[in-house]
Amino acid sequence: MNVAVLQFPGSNCDQDALHLFASGLKVPARYVWHKDTGLGSADLVVVPGGFSYGDYLRCGAIARFSPVMRAVRDFASAGGLVLGICNGFQILCEACLLPGALIRNSSLEYRCLTCELAVEPSTPSFGPATLGPTIRMPIGHGEGNYRIDPEGLARLRANRQVLLRYASNPNGSLDDIAGIRNETGNVFGMMPHPDRAFERFHPSQDGLAVARAVLATRFPEVLKRAG
């Protein structure tokens, strides 16, 4: 089992993401540069938080054209696991690997706080049965306001694609959405940071269970190991 953590100019959570998997879950993890055209032997690709390309034009709008994203699209199309965190979620939406878009917070302010999140029953490994009904993870973003058209929202609900909802909405996100997955259940995106919620000195350690639940989508033995 191997994890590939992407690095773009402006990424600033790549080290946190790698540390979450390498130290938190003891899974081999390595960096993949934005100019690379392959992902090696990755079993999970993590698109980390930060400000890729300085957030110029629009969050994630330039990163989607990076050479490595062609490899990520091919990887996801073949059923490979992909996790986008914060700016990574924005990039996955821009790349059409996840539906919808993330726009400026309704307050027009950058929000940085720990949020209580309701866990939705989305997949066998990602739901209240494995994570509990609520978890706590921090956010840090100016553009986390999730938007999608009414038909798209209906599909998200019908297919149980919503992973997490804010208990107290910090950014105006439609339907309190904090995280979603694609229809086939192998691409995950969320604005809260599991990579900032797993060390003993963090306000919460729930991020470790979130990362484990994503991995367990393809590798259920990860959950057994945790038990």
Residue spans for each PLM region:
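Pocket-forming structural segment of enzyme catalytic cores
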Residues: 97-176
